[in-house]
């Protein structure tokens, strides 16, 4: 942070302190080059593999479950013999998808379509020149046990870990789900159900949905005796494409009309929600299927509804372009009155709600003709936002309510700067708090916006840490905590109890930066990120930091640990973080990129003053064609057992530890 700017902030802090009560088949040479490139990036992708296990800093594992698949090709899928039988679910309650919900005719730049002609007209506004893309059997089961093995247990009535969420009460899909008695593991083309009720973990069943070579399984949800699997697929379709553009309106280099046959690999991208009856875990039964157009973007589960968000590119190209513009949801064309359109829209953002009591159809849907949006979903509303870089860096935000699964547009607004962190946007009591970074000028600038229920500005704090960027954020009660970074990592605290007058409280500086912040009980805030060279900003290791935030005016660093690893899954994907504040545990996977590349799962315990290493489980990558990275390595718990799951392309390993004996 520049010294002058820091002094200005110190003055603000001093003045405020007087008035405030603290309240995620390559050649070796190519792989090595890719590893080197990734090592120097702030955000990383994936890598890695294998079953070799080394234990450090803890007693041996009490049990190991390895499920390996035999002869298997990456693009080959299960046969029809592997498909579960289809059965109907008993429906005790339904929601009428034709229920009338009053819709606003205008929100910001969006206008509610009155007919399909309004939709076609909006698509036609876009030039043709801007074409873009929218978007085996079990071989062995074996166990390794020792004297530290956990005692057999019945149906779990104790605590178990859940997916680490962005918003409490708003569930998110993941590659593994845990209900305390069973683990549900998504691995390439199948979902495996594992019984973890006693020490001898065992595979109960394996679900292999019907897939084509272009289908992929993405995420899971579990709700009592129902398992929900999200898959995405696309068809390569042959279509006669004829341009009706003229020289005057075509800037692509093609003059006049042309006619050709083209293969569109993304011509029909779709997202499918599969529902399985798992009341008999050993015999899952497919009970319902709901398909909607668009590439999967995100999903959430709140109460009795799953909300699906997809997007797809639209254009006027093709002989039957009008038929392609209107998406299908559960076998029906989207209603004209559910479209919000704007000039020059190039992408359809499609929202659908699915009642868990009737998952073969959508309870409601809405389509935005736009240019693509990211999703933030609070307990009261959905916010779709996108960054724009024309005429300055800014973020457009559209707000929708979703009460009882029914969508209703509320408002749209634009703020300066871009949202750089998932947790920089947060809803509380209908109001929205946003931290943005504007890096269009010579010195980047950060802002904190406080918006009311109609997205009107209530308060604004500007000129935050000029020359730095927002790396991580967390809103706890009436305090906004956030990390900015250039060469050092200040943690800031801002009082937002009065939205009209946000006030800076305190800050504390350290080397490196945190990419993820997590509340860790009373007066503590956990930071997961990287240590860096203060002069070059080059990453030198994974860093774990505990902040004392009991007095937001006088923030302190209680302890930090630097680990000699190149990448941390939790720093890039919050779902990869395991946090148990009751036991003081924090777990995550790392990657190291050397001549021998490997993943490592690490578990630390906070003892009140420092971090103590409990698990360091190393898995070396061996087969390049089955390589997976640290984001496929997860920590979970049920009762007094801790599990390390490593999902690979053709198998997965599951290792358990007895926390009562070993921690």
Where do the model's predicted regions map?
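Disordered, charged N-terminal biogenesis/targeting segments of membrane/secreted proteins
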Residues: 1-49
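Low-complexity, intrinsically disordered/propeptide-like segments
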Residues: 4, 9, 29, 38, ...
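N-terminal non-cleavable signal-anchor helices
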Residues: 8, 21, 32, 63-67, ...
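Single-pass transmembrane signal-anchor helices and their membrane-water interface zones
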Residues: 25-39, 55-86
